Amino acid sequence: MQAFRQRIRQTVPEMRRVKQIHFVGIGGAGMGGIAEVLLNEGYQVTGSDIAESAVTSRLISLGAKISFSHHAENIEGASVVVVSSAIKGDNIEVITAHEKRIPVIQRAQMLAEIMRFRHGIAIAGTHGKTTTTAMVAMIYAQAGLDPTFVNGGLVKSAGTNAYLGCSRYLIAEADESDASFLHLQPMVSVVTNIEPEHMETYHGDFEEMKQTYVNFLRNLPFYGLSVMCADDPVLMELSSQVGRQVVTYGFSDEADYRIEDYQQTGFQGHYTVVAPNGERIDVLLNVPGKHNALNATAALTVAKEEGIENEAILTALAEFQGAGRRFDQLGQFIRPNGKVMLVDDYGHHPTEVNVTIQAARQGWENKRIVMIFQPHRYSRTRDLFDDFVQVLSQVDVLIMLDVYAAGEQAIAGADSRSLCRSIRNLGKVDPILVSDHKQLAEIVDQVIQDGDLILAQGAGNVSKLSRELALAWGKE
C-alpha cells in the first residue's frame, strides 16, 4: 500500500482572505478531520472542546491551538468559526462570533468548500459509510491517485481519519444526522442504506428524511454518478426520483454489481462480484460479515465506474485493515477462566449491532458471545426499544451499562434498567446491569469462559472501557 505522507500546502486562493479558522467542538472525528486537512493546507487552526482526546492531541501535534473550555476570547483573530452539530446557538463563542460579525458555518459547509474545486466522492447512509469511505480512500491510494480524504473514523492503514493528498480527488463521509450533507456538491455520491435515525432532524417524519436523501443525490451534476445498494428497498423506491445516472450493487439479483458465493472463514470473507459486462471479480476481505462485503462492493463499484484497474481495487481490499472501532480486535487474553478474544465495535443502532453479532457468530463458531453493551442516547433507546430487546437477546451473556446520554436528559422507560427488564422477560438471556464502571472488570471475569468472544458495543465511552480492560489484562 502506498505510504501516506503529510505535506504542507499553500492556502487555496479562493479562501485567501481567510487566515485563521476556529472550530467549536474540535474534538469530534468529523471536525478534527477537516481541521487536519486545513492545517496541512497552511491555515492557522484554533479550536475549543470540553475535554482532551486522541483527536485533539493529534491536532495539537500538527500545530493547532486548542482550549479545553468555551470562552469568548478563544475566537480572537478568527476569520471564520466552524461549529459541530453538537454545539448550540447559546454557546459563548458562537454568540461572540455573531457579535463581531465573524461568519459562523456548519462543519459540512467547510467540507463543501474543500470539495468545491476537487472531484468529490461523498459516501452517505445510515450504516456502513465510515468503512466504505475508508475502503474507497484505500483503493484510490493503491491506484496511485493520492486522494484527500475526510472520514468519520480512523482509517487504520493511514493512521488518521483525514489526509491531504496531491490529486484532485476528495473522498468524504457525508453526514445525514443534521442534514448538513446537503451542502456538498460531489461528482459521485454513494448511499449505503436508509433507516429511520436522527429523526429529530427530520421532525419525526421518515418521508422527509427520504426526500432529503433525494435532494442530496440531486446535488450531483447531470453527468454525475449515484451509487446505491440494491438490497435496500427504500433506496430502490427512491432511485427513479434522483434524475441522475444510478448504478447499484448488492446481493440482489437486480444489482448491477452483484455479489455471489459469499463465504466467511474465521474473520475473513471471500466472494465474487459479477460486473454489468459479465466480468467475474473474486474479492478477499480481512474484515468479517456480509455487511462488509456490501461496503467493499460499494467501494469497488465506485472504483470500477471511475476506471480504476482491478489489481489496485483487489489489493486495497485484501490489505484493508478496517476502520477505527469497527469490529476492532483488541487481542486475545489469558484470564483465570481461560483464553478470550476482546473486540471493540462502534455499532449502536439495532441493525448495526445485529450484523456485528452475525459476523461474530460466523467467525467464532460454537463459541459464546459475551456483549458489553452501552446504549447511546435516551431518544434512540426509546425510539428503537423493541428492536434493541430482540437484537440484544441473541447474545449468550449480556452486560448492560447505563445509557450514554450524549447531552440528553433521561427519558422515563428508556433507560438501561427498563431495557434489561424487557430483555429478561423475553426469556433468552438474563442481562447483568452494571452502573458502576469500576465493577466492570470484576464482573467480566466472573462470567467469561474459555473461548469466549467479548464484544464491547456502543458509541459512548464503552470503547475507552474496553481498552482499559485490554491494558489491564495484557495481551497473550
Curated annotation (Swiss-Prot):
Gene3D superfamilies for this protein: Mur ligase, C-terminal domain, Mur-like, catalytic domain, NAD(P)-binding Rossmann-like Domain
Role according to the record: Cell wall formation.
Catalytic activity: UDP-N-acetyl-alpha-D-muramate + L-alanine + ATP = UDP-N-acetyl-alpha-D-muramoyl-L-alanine + ADP + phosphate + H(+)
Gene Ontology cellular-component terms listed: cytoplasm
Enzyme Commission code(s) on record: 6.3.2.8
Subcellular location: Cytoplasm
Full protein name: UDP-N-acetylmuramate--L-alanine ligase
Residues binding ATP, per UniProt: 125-131
